[in-house]
Amino acid sequence: VELRIDSYFPGSEGDAEDTLRIETLRSLIADCPLPVILTCRSAEEGGDYDGDESDRVSLLEKLCVNVEHPPAYLDFELAAYQRSANIRQKINLCVDHPKQQRDVRTRLILSMHDFDQRPSDLMRRLADAWAEPAASVVKFAYRCRSIRDNLEIFEILRDAPKPTIGLGMGEFGLMSRVLAPKFNGFLTFASLRDSAATAPGQPTISDLLGMYRTRSIGKDTRVYGVIGWPVTQSMSPLIHNAGFEARGWDGVYLPMPVAADASDIELSAHSVGVTVNQMMDARKIRWCGASITIPFKEAIEHDAFASHVVRDPNEDVIDIGAANTLAVRDRGEGFPIVDLYNTDATAISALLQDAMERVSGSKIVVVGAGGVALAAGHSIVSRGGKLIVAARRLEQATALVERLNGPTVWDDEPGGSFRGEAKAVKLDELLERPADVYINCTPVGMTGGPDPEGLSIPVHDLAGTLPPETVFFDTVYNPIETPMLKAAREHGFRTIDGVEMFVRQAVAQFELWTGEQAPMQLFDRLVRERLGG
């Protein structure tokens, strides 16, 4: 347990109750059933203590020297330790080291922190800290700017000459915190709750021990993740980690943010390609697969991605031009290859098959023109369905139809186009196109989206022309009941919610990675509980 006392003893007040505070801290240390790390972090390294340095050192002496229950560790900054011979001498009196002549049990953690970036002189600082005889443990933490920063942290931990703590701060640094046991990290840090975090990106102890099961992580643990921008709100870590635990699979699944510009597919493809290549090169991580989400589903099929990674897309990915699942396979002699899949298409096919006697010959409307709409359209056309793609702008719908079927042939109906069994129409023409199934593949109705109260499909207007067995399917899963699904249920139509699709695509991913049957009911329950449904 780390006791962060810098906000309790800021040092700038000259408080007359310092003696009482010291006695309170001594009692806390004595009563703690676990080893204590005592830290009074200076303001210049991200803490709250902004008082005189001699007062801070005096406080630490009173808590570590000539007391019945001293802390197990004292964390003190390398920069402050090196700044003054007097401070260095006093800190050395508080801790055990080769020249210590007192009966002292506290050990020194020499630490360094940079909340902005990787320090340019990081390796020099580490060499100084490792060479200090009084330091039992060395700690370094800096703000990660990419996944690559985590990989360097792991390399440092693996080769460290003495016990070392290496942590990445910020959204990009979570991997370093969770995988610390895999690379001999002396320990990692977690907060009791989000509001109590002492560094940006610090997970809660419930997430670290529960969802990520960090105590079960070892050198052979397989690593998976969700690649996207952003990924902090993804529910994939929740369900895949639970699935690994349920099946006894030695794996952990992490958010893997990759910064991207959604408007520049080539740049996005380059960014994700570099990251995937770096992860594959870091063999000790044992990276085995990933989910691919916005904005990389189509970027991963771009030539700019292929320039970095040897890939093998399956037939669905080739036809759709987008992938949402990556599996790393060794093709022999230690050369890995990336297999690409689209489990969105797999999930949509399975759900349509469950909901209908047959897809072949059925008329199905897909609203939207993005990656999910493309996967849905492919699932329908490849199974003989009659597809109608509806978008606000006809050219968007037409472009999607062309990607599915080749060049578009215009028909003689106003505003419509088709080739074979696929047609493109404007969204406001849906009333003229009664169908057996309607699928929303837009963010309309999504919590936090551009139109959370909007109706993606005009259910009320369609209601008088459709039989009750008509199916309304929403790919949005938050909220579980979107405005469109609520309207469909009010009119007695059959519905498929976005949670069902999210779970089905995750099930397909899990089974591709592990070869084990996924615990689908567990996945479904966890997602609905998290969403409050």
Describe the residue ranges of each PLM region.
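Catalytic alpha/beta core domains of metabolic enzymes, predominantly
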Residues: 79-222
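Active-site beta->alpha loop and helix N-cap motifs at the rims of alpha/beta catalytic domains
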Residues: 3-119
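Glycine-rich adenosine-cofactor-binding loop
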Residues: 168, 223-231, 342-345, 352, ...
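Rossmann-like adenosine-cofactor binding region
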Residues: 414-495
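Phosphate/diphosphate ligand-binding glycine-rich loop within oxidoreductases
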Residues: 221-357
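Adenosine-phosphate binding glycine-rich loop
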Residues: 467-533
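Conserved S-adenosyl-L-methionine
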Residues: 382-386, 491-493
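NAD(P)-binding Rossmann-fold cofactor-contacting core
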Residues: 385-414
